[in-house]
């Protein structure tokens, strides 16, 4: 039966998509209306069993939809229609005629919903979908209990709350009272229909605590024991309505002046905290920028003042790529306690590296050699619950964090990186600022002059050299074109996803590129008091990468500030080691130049 259901859902989805030109989300809305009509009919008059022609079937479908609008006015508006052609309606009802939804077991009903979710969200509208592995981890960390009130103020498909009910059901018998203790809130009517259908299919609930509303502008009568949420984030959906912003501390600057706009995830932090009972707990998925950006310190200070932070869990890069976004995110676990900042406490920092699926657009499950799902979030959960710490899962004092501008970046405190940096500082070391100067003066660009222009992509990360450039008039240069280069300058990328990795761009400027203009995505080091090869060698080490990782911030374009860069600790070697490094790099670069000239000669003249 499961295979038959899969085939029917797929055929219907493909038919509507091909014949109606609807997107996945619009197909979802049609599917839900049809499934509601069929379920409603089976529980009432069985009109569909009495149809004798396609015309009769079509008219019956219209009658059922009208009945639905009367029965569920909070779910269906008076203007709701199927919004597809008559023949498509007939096709869908015929495809579903071979099985009775109300006669299916709970598991099969749940499978129908999951199949719809997979087709409509995982394959199209991922912003409403949180990976099940992350949902499962969060629910186990929060540990919802029977009798507690829980909600998600931006519930999407309702995954968090359904998972919370499953968690409670693992040790208790689920009753109507348990379902009545959970609350769903979302702005989307279509998503509300999906949740209501799942509640009806799995729990027989016909009048759930399901509210179609914008949670940021709405008032709530209840306070909750736990809240689980992955609120919408990103600059594209910024809130600019002053009537909404005025309701939030985080909608204003420190002087109380309204921001012109604010991203929704920041407002949701405040909303969620306000909805918690004293002692209530919450888990919120947030972009890493909220944890680390210097300009976001007011957000973190607000959280510190209102809550006890229990844990910060760093999610892997690419966790949400299969679901529509590549933004790096972490999970914030809090307990509402405005007195928590008055005495120091420890905050757990954990890092999940594997979630059991591949981080690609067409994601697949990933397995270990023994056939088990390849994940390590269960291990992180165990370490948190049992206070087991290591280089990647550790605790930091709240006092240390508040003294660091409330920085909550996992990488800043990671024990593994700290050990590498400490190993440098236990020996002889300098700061980058002590051995060279930084070019800060921007070149005055003349619109008619021709320039060589160097971007990060013009660097060979394997050979640490500039391999190409663009030739552009001054008027054609982008606004980021900034610094004129001199021979033996060292340029190092301080922005982009590759910084702090083996693929970070760095190069020594050769005669060929003297006078070229480079992007401000580089820091330009000049007048080194030591051999540039010593610096170049250091920029290829794990010790350098660890310090960049500790200091970088930003989710869309990771960045390390120039101030943090020049403060990086640089090891000083003994004379013999320095001479060996300089000699080896000099030989390698000379051989590379000789090979380049020989190849150039061969290309120009050939061999007779």
Where do the protein language model's features map onto the residues?
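Conserved S-adenosyl-L-methionine
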Residues: 127-229, 234-238, 287-289, 298-300, ...
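A short glycine-rich beta-alpha junction/loop motif
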Residues: 332, 411, 515-523, 552-577
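Long recognition/docking surfaces used for binding and targeting
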Residues: 31-119
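A short beta-sheet element
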Residues: 487-539
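Flexible, glycine-/basic-rich loop-and-beta segments that form/coincide
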Residues: 322-427
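Non-catalytic DNA-recognition/assembly elements of restriction-modification systems
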Residues: 383-444, 572-608
